[in-house]
A protein has these predicted regions:
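Active-site-proximal alpha-helix that buttresses catalytic centers in soluble enzyme cores
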Residues: 1-285
Length: 285
């Protein structure tokens, strides 16, 4: 069952008197960081499901701490567009919204405010990752598009000793995708932990690799760091970036492997359906 099918298979709740708050990280350095949040807000406004849809950011305006002042519907659902549960989703965002520690529902000024789980830990993100992997190969089928059964799929993340949950979110998705038996191999890969992204050439047994970065937005990690970890010279990556070109050419041959590198999953068209599932879960709790 697809994300959209599982969303539509449930009874249609009435959210016409509810506000949806989409919460992104944002960035003072990279204007593109907030683009997926705005994109999904626009799409959900277009669907006309909620009485109001607003956005908020940690590093940009409107600030998370102020966003509830603009919410005017009696029910409010706050969905963090983050990949994993961790410091931001467990502590920073609830605190900025005014939730008491440990609470996920609060009454405030005649409103019932729900704090939903992050999109990245939802099981249906599996479909988002698979869609991204398949469309990347389909767009660049040179010399021919390999079948998933001939391909090693890598889900790439930051990885950090400070937050093991970011690793867990990726490993969970790897297990779910592996269970589908579509790809010859499915592996996790990290920037700052083992197994490293650069080691994908040794790990993959097939001659085709697809690398999907499990980030909400494209930024320095996905545009610069990962292509260089995959073996592109820094000079070439930076010159392509400055020229507005893709920093990785799909596919590129390295170490006897053909490598397709996907954009981040943040703007994938399935994401609004994942957001809706998070809202429905909170409404039913």
């Amino acid at each position: 069952m697809t994300v959209a099918q599982s969303a539509s298979a449930k009874p249609t709740e009435d959210f016409s008197r509810a506000t949806l708050v989409l919460i992104g990280h944002g960035s003072t350095l990279n204007a593109e960081s907030s683009a997926p949040t705005h994109q999904h807000a626009d799409e959900l406004k277009r669907r006309n499901i909620f009485g109001q849809v607003v956005t908020a950011f940690w590093k940009e305006e409107p600030a998370i701490s102020a966003v509830l002042r603009s919410a005017y519907q009696p029910r409010v659902y706050c969905v963090p567009l983050f990949i994993s549960e961790g410091y931001f989703t467990e502590e920073v965002i609830p605190r900025e919204l005014g939730f008491p520690p440990g609470q996920r529902v609060m009454q405030k000024g005649g409103q019932t405010i729900h704090y939903c789980g992050p999109i990245g830990t939802h099981d249906s993100m599996t479909e988002v990752l698979l869609a991204r992997a398949k469309e990347t190969v389909a767009k660049h089928p040179f010399p021919r598009a390999p079948k998933p059964s001939e391909t090693a799929l890598f889900i790439a993340g930051h990885g950090t000793g400070n937050n093991e949950n970011s690793r867990k979110a990726i490993e969970h998705q790897v297990e779910l995708i592996r269970a589908k038996n579509e790809y010859a191999e499915v592996h996790s890969a990290f920037m700052e932990e083992d197994p490293r992204i650069a080691d994908c050439y040794k790990v993959a047994k097939t001659s085709n690799i697809v690398m999907v970065p499990f980030f909400v937005s494209d930024g320095l990690h996905s545009f610069e760091d990962i292509p260089m970890m995959l073996g592109e010279p820094e000079r070439l990556v930076k010159s392509r970036l400055a020229a507005g070109q893709p920093t990785w050419r799909n596919p590129t041959e390295k170490k006897g492997k053909l490598v397709w590198y996907a954009p981040s999953i943040g703007n994938e068209p399935h994401i609004p359906d994942v957001i809706l599932q998070r809202v429905r879960e909170a409404a039913a709790a």
